[in-house]
């Protein structure tokens, strides 16, 4: 139970329940990340304490956005090793969560995690965000989309906003310096049907890590031509 207190403290800070079952799930998940990371590139962060703080607690802090608990159907775009989707699912098993990643090896890992942790109502999808967003079963079907992927806010908005129903939210998990990026991405956000609501500063317990949650509300439907075809989104970001 070495890391119980720090994880419990992080959950208390954001008003989310924590118990021994959730703790055990996080520890099993950590061990699986470390084991699979020997075979495939999941993360450069591999030490026990670093995974707990820089990955798990950082993901827990998404609940700093107080409306997040009320978002029942969630998609995690560019999930990688399952961040923040798996921690969200551990903390709120009743949420419907879809994890999307373009690398099939990562999806196989996430399938194993879902099986080992006995997670239900979760789906791990292999493919590109711009392809799934044009499918009727996914387009504008989600209460919230989250992303911790490394891309600027204009690119992330084009990947993510098409999935969100009007009245839902896009939560982008960004580093400490976002103001310039936000200024450059405002037109793209508006064009895609979004409106910047707030930027929430996040601090991680027992560390000097500081991040930001960029909260974008979906206020109108995304035009059908977005997202553009594979490659265009990143090569020519909307401005």
UniProtKB/Swiss-Prot annotation:
Protein's UniProt name: Ribosomal RNA small subunit methyltransferase G
Q: Which GO terms describe its molecular function?
A: rRNA (guanine-N7-)-methyltransferase activity
Residues annotated to bind S-adenosyl-L-methionine: 78, 83, 129-130, 148
Q: Which UniProt keywords apply?
A: Cytoplasm, Methyltransferase, rRNA processing, S-adenosyl-L-methionine, Transferase
Q: Which gene encodes it?
A: rsmG
Tell me the protein family, please.
Belongs to the methyltransferase superfamily. RNA methyltransferase RsmG family.
* Subcellular locations according to the entry: Cytoplasm
Role noted for this protein: Specifically methylates the N7 position of a guanine in 16S rRNA.
What Enzyme Commission number(s) appear in the record?
Answer: 2.1.1.-
Organism domain of life: Bacteria
Stretches assigned to coiled coil: none
Pfam families according to UniProt: GidB (PF02527)
Major location (coarse): cytoplasm
Q: Which residues cross the membrane?
A: none
Output a single Gene Ontology CC term carried by this record: cytosol
**Enzyme superclass (EC):** transferase
Q: Which InterPro entries does the UniProt entry name for this protein?
A: rRNA_ssu_MeTfrase_G, SAM-dependent_MTases_sf
């Amino acid at each position: 139970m070495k890391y119980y207190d720090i994880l419990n403290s992080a959950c208390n800070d954001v008003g989310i329940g924590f118990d021994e079952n959730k703790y055990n799930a996080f520890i099993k998940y950590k061990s699986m990340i470390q084991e699979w990371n020997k075979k495939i590139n999941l993360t450069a962060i591999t030490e026990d304490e670093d995974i707990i703080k820089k990955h798990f607690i950082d993901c827990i802090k998404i609940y700093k956005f107080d409306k997040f608990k009320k978002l029942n159907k969630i998609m995690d775009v560019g999930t990688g090793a399952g961040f923040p989707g798996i921690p969200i699912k551990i903390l709120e098993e009743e949420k419907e969560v879809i994890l999307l990643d373009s690398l099939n090896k990562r999806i196989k890992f996430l399938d194993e995690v879902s099986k080992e942790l006995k997670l239900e109502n979760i789906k791990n999808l292999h493919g590109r965000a711009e392809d799934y967003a044009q499918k009727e079963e996914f387009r504008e079907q989600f209460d919230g989309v989250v992303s911790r992927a490394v891309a600027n806010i204009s690119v992330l908005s084009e990947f993510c906003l098409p999935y969100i129903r009007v009245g839902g939210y896009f939560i982008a998990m960004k580093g400490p310096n976002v103001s310039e990026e936000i200024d450059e991405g405002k037109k793209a956000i508006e064009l895609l049907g979004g409106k910047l609501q707030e930027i929430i500063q996040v601090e991680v317990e027992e560390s000097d890590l500081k991040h930001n949650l960029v909260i974008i509300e979906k206020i109108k439907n995304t035009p059908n031509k977005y997202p553009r075809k594979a490659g265009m989104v990143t090569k020519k970001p909307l401005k």
